[in-house]
Design a protein with these regions (language model features):
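Surface-exposed coil loops of outer-membrane beta-barrel proteins
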Residues: 84, 126-140, 160-247, 252-255, ...
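Beta-barrel outer-membrane channel/assembly domains of diderm bacteria
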Residues: 2-4, 8-10, 18-27, 31-169, ...
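Outer-membrane beta-barrel biogenesis signature
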Residues: 29-65, 167-225, 271-278, 387-392, ...
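Transmembrane beta-barrel outer-membrane domains
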Residues: 58-60, 86-93, 139-144, 227-229, ...
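Residue-level detector of the transmembrane beta-barrel scaffold of outer-membrane proteins
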Residues: 64-66, 110-114, 158-160, 245-247, ...
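Transmembrane beta-strands of outer-membrane beta-barrel pores
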Residues: 71-77, 117-121, 165-167, 250-254, ...
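Detector for outer-membrane/organellar transmembrane beta-barrel domains
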Residues: 259-462
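Outer-membrane beta-barrel and related beta-rich outer-membrane complex signature
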Residues: 79, 125-127, 171-180, 297-299, ...
Length: 517
């Protein structure tokens, strides 16, 4: 056993063994002379290496490599075009990272870090009818997801500093007791980057300038249910008390938020001993809030965002512009372990009081509407003997329905030139759409509302021995937009008129797998 030897003695022992084995392998020779100066140079080099390693008495850092691969074959139909892509499934993207921990020697406190990146190629959330590989992602071939250091205690919780999750991040998915959110969750990560298509326009010229995400998003992200993202800041995550955990944080520049999560098991009739693995019910829930006053959003910095909002002057400009976006969201899930039956639900609200969105509607003079969305899913997750599936792991079948209302994301990036005046989404703060923004709508309009619905069916098969999941999902989505105008070609008297804009449905089917390491 060499476990108790120093680096120097282990290398010397290995060298000696190599010399001895080599002497036998090459036939009878004189006994190897291991004395004298034969190993002096080697010892000197080892001493140099030891000087660059953690010395005895310092706290050693253990490093863990982790990650996952998640790929799918995507078949899609936008109402006219049908096609096939191979994608990186952004419901839970492929990624890898490093975690390091070290004991501080002070109670149970440990220090550590986390660095995590994801490849951006073929990101399913960024593909569309014209782009099947996302080769020119602005983040480059790799996107940094996490980069922070922390101090953690089982008793007092964990403090983080750096690029990390905001408290509300994933609040609508990470308390799901089935843990099926990596196959499909409430957002539309497989097609949100696709362009809307007008009914009756079946060629490339029939595609709108707006994407699905432009009418189904929070005011500060391209998602409707995962509004808060990962930001640069400081955060606190509590230990778990009887299933409850709390988190709060403050992030550049400026955003703050808090969240409460719960995950536990229970028995309807109690037992007097608290939660137990023998309890027949699993339950999870979470609720979170965030307030974002970052004038420049994700580009850092702050302060006034000056300059006009093209193509219109005041009052739709950025003079003394102030950001004010608020999000709150939550979820709940329950599973009956003996039968495998489960139910999941999520909700999300987002509103903006940005100074250039208040009473800024181009034709109506109204403020931006509140975005709201809800999702319900239900199914069964258990071992099935059919075709020997129970030998692999749990099998899950489920379906769901969701609705997202007024997800217009009509806010502006702010910041300094050239960002001032640019829109965060595809809809400006005054919600003005020029003629033919939506093909077939030949007059300028104001978009006052939207509705996106989705129903879905899904299958997931765990392969426990390989730490893998295989899955297949079908989704059907519909979209409606509310448009008004006072354009004289439609309203000679200048009265507010509704404008129709029928849009094609979107169907997709994807099947693939993910493996964790």
């Amino acid at each position: 056993m060499l476990g108790g030897l120093s680096l120097r003695h282990r290398v010397l022992a290995a060298t000696a063994a190599t010399v001895l084995i080599g002497s036998f392998a090459h036939g009878p020779v004189k006994a190897a002379d291991l004395g004298g100066d034969c190993c002096a140079d080697l010892e000197e080099r080892i001493a140099e290496l030891e000087a660059t390693t953690v010395r005895k008495g310092n706290k050693k850092v253990s490093v863990t490599l982790y990650g996952q691969e998640n790929h799918a074959a995507l078949f899609w139909d936008d109402g006219a075009e049908k096609n096939f892509y191979v994608v990186d499934n952004n419901y839970e993207s492929s990624r890898f990272g490093f975690k390091g921990t070290a004991k501080t020697g002070f109670g149970d406190w440990v220090g550590g870090y986390r660095l995590e990146v994801e490849p951006t190629g073929a990101n399913s959330a960024k593909l569309n009818q014209f782009d099947d590989d996302n080769a020119n992602d602005s983040a480059g071939p790799l996107n940094v997801r996490h980069s922070y250091m922390y101090l953690s205690s089982k008793t007092y919780g964990e403090g983080r500093m750096g690029l990390t999750a905001t408290p509300i991040y994933n609040i609508t998915k990470d308390t799901n007791v089935t843990e099926l959110e990596d196959t499909m969750h409430s957002d539309n990560r497989m097609m949100q980057g696709f362009f809307l298509r007008s009914k009756g326009f079946d060629n490339a010229e029939g595609l709108s300038k707006l994407k699905w995400q432009n009418i189904s998003s929070c005011y500060d992200s391209n998602n409707a249910f995962v509004c808060g993202t990962r930001k640069n800041g400081v955060a606190y995550w509590s230990p778990t008390w009887a299933g409850f955990s709390f988190s709060t944080g403050y992030f550049e520049d400026d955003e703050w938020g808090a969240a409460l999560r719960y995950k536990n098991s229970f028995s309807l009739w109690g037992g007097g001993s608290g939660a137990s693995e023998d309890d027949p019910w699993l339950v999870g829930a979470g609720i979170g809030y965030s307030k974002n006053t970052d004038e420049r959003y994700q580009t850092g910095g702050g302060g006034d965002a000056n300059g006009p909002n093209p193509p219109f002057p005041a009052p739709n400009n950025f003079r003394n512009f102030k950001r004010d976006v608020q999000d709150w969201a939550g979820s709940a899930s329950i599973k009956h372990k003996p039968t495998g039956l489960f139910l999941f639900s999520a909700f999300s609200f987002s509103e903006t009081n940005d100074t250039n969105t208040i009473h800024s509607g181009f034709y109506t003079g109204t403020s931006a509407p509140q975005m709201n969305g809800w999702d319900v899913q239900g199914g069964i997750q258990r071992d099935f003997d059919f075709l020997g599936l129970s030998k692999l792991g749990e099998t899950s079948f489920w379906g769901g329905y969701e609705q997202i209302n007024d997800g217009l994301a009509s806010v502006s990036l702010g910041g300094n030139f050239p960002d001032n005046g640019k829109n965060f989404g595809g809809i400006p703060a005054d919600r003005f759409l020029s003629a033919n923004t939506i093909i077939g709508v030949a007059v300028p309009t104001e978009i006052t509302g939207s509705e996106v619905t989705r129903w879905s069916l899904a299958f997931d098969q765990a392969v426990d021995s390989a730490n893998m999941h295989l899955y297949a999902v079908y989704q059907h989505l519909t979209a409606d937009v509310d448009l008004v105008t006072r354009d004289p070609t439609v309203s000679p008297t200048g009265k507010l008129k509704n404008v129709g804009a029928p849009l094609d449905d979107f169907d997709l089917f994807y099947t693939g797998g993910r493996i964790y390491f």
